[in-house]
């Protein structure tokens, strides 16, 4: 498997992005991953600011093990013959089996839990406990896309911000729509290496629905300003193509 576009962990092995901008340490890169993982895991769990800051100090495997533990109710390890029979529970057999297998498939203990509380824990286990091994790998381009999308929705509340899957569209009444493509790619200002993305932007403009296309990448030390792109074959059209740096620093600032 090619791990080039993935971040996360495979057992004790961590796949963190190369250091960039102010993300110059293992702790900051872990914190970045924990924050961005919320976009994919939002229906299962959420790492709050405190967890992001403190779990970043330990390996990602341990961080997710701690998160699973925090999602389980306090009575998770009660034996069948010791639990409070006067307390009512809605048992979820599938979730119970998942959690039992996660802790110890040979144990004689059985979990007596409230299914409403258990389901997130079981779902998280099913996402990151694969073949009896802790593992969670995510597409970094998807994570960056979701991060930019959330930022744009907060910034342009008076406009229509649409997630088109491979791109983002911003529409406003009586104004030509803007199309945005995101990519987690290290950009060097003198040699940005974005020919493929620019050619795609040219085709989008030629189709006529958009005259502005922005190519957004993570901000880095050598990529701090917009890079305008001029295209000879579009010189008689009104258009705008830009490569734009997008900062991820707010993730660190939020958790200080």
Regions found by a protein language model. Give the residues of each.
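Terminal, charged accessory segments of proteins
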Residues: 1-137
């Amino acid at each position: 498997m090619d791990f080039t576009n993935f971040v996360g962990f495979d057992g004790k092995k961590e796949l963190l992005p190369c250091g960039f901008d102010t993300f110059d340490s293992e702790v900051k890169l872990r914190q970045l991953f924990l924050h961005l993982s919320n976009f994919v895991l939002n229906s299962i769990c959420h790492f709050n600011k405190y967890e992001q800051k403190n779990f970043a100090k330990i390996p990602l495997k341990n961080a997710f093990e701690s998160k699973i533990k925090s999602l389980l109710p306090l009575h998770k390890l009660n034996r069948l013959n010791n639990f409070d029979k006067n307390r009512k529970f809605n048992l979820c057999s599938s979730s119970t089996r998942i959690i039992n297998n996660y802790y110890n498939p040979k144990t004689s203990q059985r979990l007596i839990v409230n299914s409403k509380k258990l389901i997130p824990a079981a779902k998280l286990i099913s996402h990151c406990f694969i073949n009896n091994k802790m593992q969670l790998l995510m597409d970094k381009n998807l994570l960056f896309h979701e991060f930019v999308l959330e930022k744009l929705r907060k910034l342009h509340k008076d406009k229509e911000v649409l997630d088109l899957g491979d791109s983002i569209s911003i529409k406003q009444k009586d104004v030509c729509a803007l199309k945005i493509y995101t990519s987690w790619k290290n950009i060097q200002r003198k040699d940005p290496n974005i020919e493929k993305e620019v050619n795609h932007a040219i085709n989008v403009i030629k189709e006529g629905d958009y005259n502005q296309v922005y190519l957004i990448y993570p901000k880095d030390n050598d990529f701090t300003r917009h890079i305008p792109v001029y295209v000879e074959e579009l010189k008689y059209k009104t258009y705008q193509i830009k490569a734009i740096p997008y900062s991820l620093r707010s993730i660190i600032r939020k958790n200080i």
